[in-house]
UniProtKB/Swiss-Prot annotation:
It comes from Bacillus mycoides (strain KBAB4). This is Bifunctional protein FolD. Catalyzes the oxidation of 5,10-methylenetetrahydrofolate to 5,10-methenyltetrahydrofolate and then the hydrolysis of 5,10-methenyltetrahydrofolate to 10-formyltetrahydrofolate. Homodimer. NCBIfam families: PRK10792.1 (NF008058), PRK14186.1 (NF010783).
Length: 286
């Protein structure tokens, strides 16, 4: 058996085309979806991510506004900027690019964003709604992972999902999303004693730990869906995931590559949330 490769870039393009059609219809009603991105400092990786978000907005017709602030900005001044955007009817989504400088408390910044504009899905109210199965903005990477698994046409209900990783951004929320789909979910992390044995029980294995090629064929149940969230740069400069792709390819049923796997879906789900926020707000732009 050779695994089917789930091409996240192709799935993302298909979904962006659908979003573009939705944006056209909203604009016919006088509604223009708007996303504000706050970038603090000059971190090259953060700037690269922001450019990807701007490009995505342009692709589907979303108005985007980039607010660039110096690394020396105070937490109080940043909170004032968020308050301004909370009150701006042109803006349906607010995203603060993380990480922030050490003197700024990320928790305080995230909690200041209006839940109605929390298109990253990080606000505690958004998280609580997700946990209880209510309609809310889902966190972008976990939502993208769920959509990729749905592309396999696998019936998620009753399946065993194993998540390796417990970050607040990916690991914890992605398990909850699959629980909401009636899967049975097992979390593994650095203190789990028998990760390999547990992984081998997974119908769907999601790996998000930041360790290059950690997961090999002996972690994989034959025919399993393997979702690799990791992005690691080797000494050669080549990107690789947390899964040893070539080693696992002959055991898995489906697998995402790195790059062009989960990554393109993250920004696409951000665009999805921004469009949904605009629909809910229904504010006609003058």
């Amino acid at each position: 058996m050779v695994a089917v490769i789930i091409k996240g870039n192709e799935v993302a393009e298909k979904k962006r085309a659908q979003l573009k059609e939705k944006v056209v219809k909203l604009k016919e009603q006088g509604i223009v979806p708007g996303l504000a991105v706050i970038l603090v400092g000059e971190d090259p990786a953060s700037r690269s991510y922001v450019k990807g978000k701007e490009k995505g907005c342009e692709q589907v017709g979303i108005y985007s506004e980039l607010i660039e602030l110096p690394e020396t900005i105070t937490e109080e001044r940043l909170l004032v900027e968020i308050d301004r955007l909370n009150g701006d009817d042109r803006i349906n989504g607010i995203l603060v690019q993380l990480p922030l400088p050490k003197h700024i408390e990320e928790k305080a910044i995230i909690e200041r964003i209006s839940p109605e504009k929390d298109v990253d899905g990080f606000h505690p109210i958004s998280v609580g709604r997700m946990m209880t199965g209510q309609d809310t903005f889902l966190p972008c990477t976990p939502h993208g992972i769920l959509e990729l698994v749905k592309e396999t046409n696998l019936d998620i209900s009753g399946k065993h999902v194993v998540v390796i990783g417990r970050s607040n951004i990916v690991g914890k929320p992605v398990g909850q999303l699959f629980l909401n789909e009636n899967a049975t979910v097992t979390y593994c992390h650095s203190k789990t004693r028998n990760i390999k044995e547990l992984s081998k029980l997974a119908d769907i294995l999601i790996v998000a730990v930041g360790r290059p090629k950690m997961v090999t064929a002996d972690y994989i149940k034959e025919g399993a869906v393997v979702i690799d969230v990791g992005v690691n740069r080797l000494e050669t400069g080549k990107l690789c995931g947390d899964v040893d792709f070539d080693n696992v390819l002959d055991v898995a049923g489906y697998i995402t590559p790195v790059p062009k796997g989960v990554g393109p879906m993250t920004i696409t789900m951000l665009l999805h949330n921004t469009v949904e926020s605009a629909k809910r707000a229904g504010v006609v732009c003058q």
